[in-house]
């Protein structure tokens, strides 16, 4: 097995090389903080002989599965170390993976360490899934799909170059210079464009998965400063 990144492997099966995506988790992308650590962690976990349990094929044609190293589930081990997040739609093992993520966050392991991406970042901020799944077909109500950032601090929160993301590898919103939330203030983020108040993501498709998702707020260096998960 050869490591491609923190949640992907290249596997030789009887002379046929296939790309494998670890099921139920998502590690930081190659250009994001903690990506190198996650890749090294996966490399260590599969250093000895590993067993692949195939469960699906993704939209890119990659095999999706669970990887076992002895009695250890590698997918879960990465989450337990804070080197990947648990996906809400991780199917039958989602509850166990989510529990592993909760433990990693509680103990500030890996990507959940306030100093994971350089100098320690402390921000008194919370995320609220205000309306992740509004009524009517999703593409018709992007302006009603809302996540809210709440400043619990006693001073202004400057969000310049902060990033709001979901569980996926693609949805990222970087805040423009001058985006500030006052003490005790709230900022609504809609998935559509041109909201009357707050900030518009201006996405052409829904951001938040109706079957459950997580929102993460990252400081400019990539440190996670707020996280919220919801289930339908």
Regions found by a protein language model. Give the residues of each.
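Small beta-barrel nucleic-acid-binding modules, primarily SNase/OB-fold domains
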Residues: 1-232
């Amino acid at each position: 097995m050869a490591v491609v990144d923190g949640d992907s492997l290249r596997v030789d099966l009887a002379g046929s090389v296939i790309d494998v995506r670890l099921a139920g988790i998502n590690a930081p992308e190659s250009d994001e903080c903690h990506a190198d650590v996650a890749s090294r962690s996966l490399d260590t976990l599969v250093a000895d002989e590993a067993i692949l349990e195939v469960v699906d094929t993704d939209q890119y044609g990659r095999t999706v599965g669970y990887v076992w190293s002895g009695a250890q589930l590698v997918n879960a081990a990465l989450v337990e170390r804070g080197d990947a997040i648990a996906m809400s739609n991780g199917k039958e093992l989602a509850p166990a993976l989510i529990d592993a993520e909760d433990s990693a966050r509680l103990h500030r392991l890996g990507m959940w360490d306030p100093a994971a991406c350089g100098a320690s970042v402390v921000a008194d901020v919370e995320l609220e899934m205000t309306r992740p799944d509004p009524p009517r077909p999703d593409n018709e109500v992007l302006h009603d799909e809302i996540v809210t950032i709440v400043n619990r601090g006693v001073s202004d929160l400057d969000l310049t170059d902060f990033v709001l993301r979901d569980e996926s590898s693609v949805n990222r919103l970087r805040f423009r210079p001058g985006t500030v939330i006052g003490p005790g203030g709230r900022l609504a983020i809609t998935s559509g464009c041109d909201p009357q108040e707050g900030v518009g993501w201006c996405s052409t498709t829904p951001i938040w998965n109706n079957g459950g998702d997580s929102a993460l707020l990252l400081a400019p260096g990539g440190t996670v400063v707020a996280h919220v998960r919801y289930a339908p």
